[in-house]
Every structure is written in C-alpha cells, then in structure tokens.
Amino acid sequence: MATRFKGLYNKSFKCFSDIFDVEEEEEMEIGYPTDVRHVSHIGWDSSSSSAPSWLHEFKTSNNVLEPNSSWPFQDLKSAMEAFGEVESSKEMERESTKQNLKKKLSSKASLLCNSWSPRFSRSSKVLA
C-alpha cells in the first residue's frame, strides 16, 4: 500500500508540475525577412501586382485636389454646404428669439409706465 501511495504521489506531482510548464513562443527578431506586410504599405510599393483589387479604385495621381478629380470632395463640399444652411437657420432662429424678447420687454415696459395700469396705481398709493 505504501508503494501504491508513493506511485500515486509521484504521478500526481509530475502531472501537477506539467500545469506550470510554460512553453516559450518563438520571438520575431527585427531585421530578418518575414512574411508580414503592413497595411499602410500595400499599394505604395513599386509593384502594383501585389496590391489588392479593392485598392485599384483609388487613384494615386497628383490631381487629387483638382475640381475634376474623382476624389470624394464633392461629398465634403455638400456636407459643408448643409452645415452652413443649418448654421444660417440657427442664426435666423436666434434673431427671431431676440425680436420676440424685445417685443415682450417693450410691452411689459409700457404696462409699467401706463398710469391706468393696476400696478402703477398700486405703487403710487403705496408711495403716497
């Protein structure tokens, strides 16, 4: 029985130590040629055959800033115009709000200055 216990004891510790046995991964050393390609380099290499097919729809010419370019600046322009319209409508709303406030204040001021107004008569009685 002691030999059985000893065998079980040794086997369990052998398996238990295997849990903590960490295999080290191979480290990639910088400078050696690898198969890794960075996404930012695709399409900018000298060979265009290595570029993916979806990249061919983008032009790499110098006429990007020209108005006839196929670059999507038209979308940007329309977005900026829409933003300008929103800003102008906000400005118009602010102006109308200011005008409404002026009307309200002028009507309240006229009520305060009106001698037939109940406020004016009450305040004059209190002061007199």
Curated annotation (Swiss-Prot):
Identify the tissues in which this protein is expressed. Expressed in roots, leaves, stems, flowers, siliques and pollen.
Q: Residue ranges of region Disordered?
A: 84-107
Residues in domain CRIB? 30-43
Note whether Membrane occurs among the keywords: yes
What is its quaternary makeup?
Interacts with ARAC11/ROP1.
Q: Which PANTHER family match?
A: CRIB DOMAIN-CONTAINING PROTEIN RIC8, CRIB DOMAIN-CONTAINING PROTEIN RIC9
Q: What is this protein called?
A: CRIB domain-containing protein RIC9
What organism does this protein naturally occur in?
Answer: Arabidopsis thaliana (Mouse-ear cress)
Upper taxonomic classification of the species?
A: Eukaryota, Viridiplantae, Streptophyta, Embryophyta, Tracheophyta
Q: Which gene encodes it?
A: RIC9
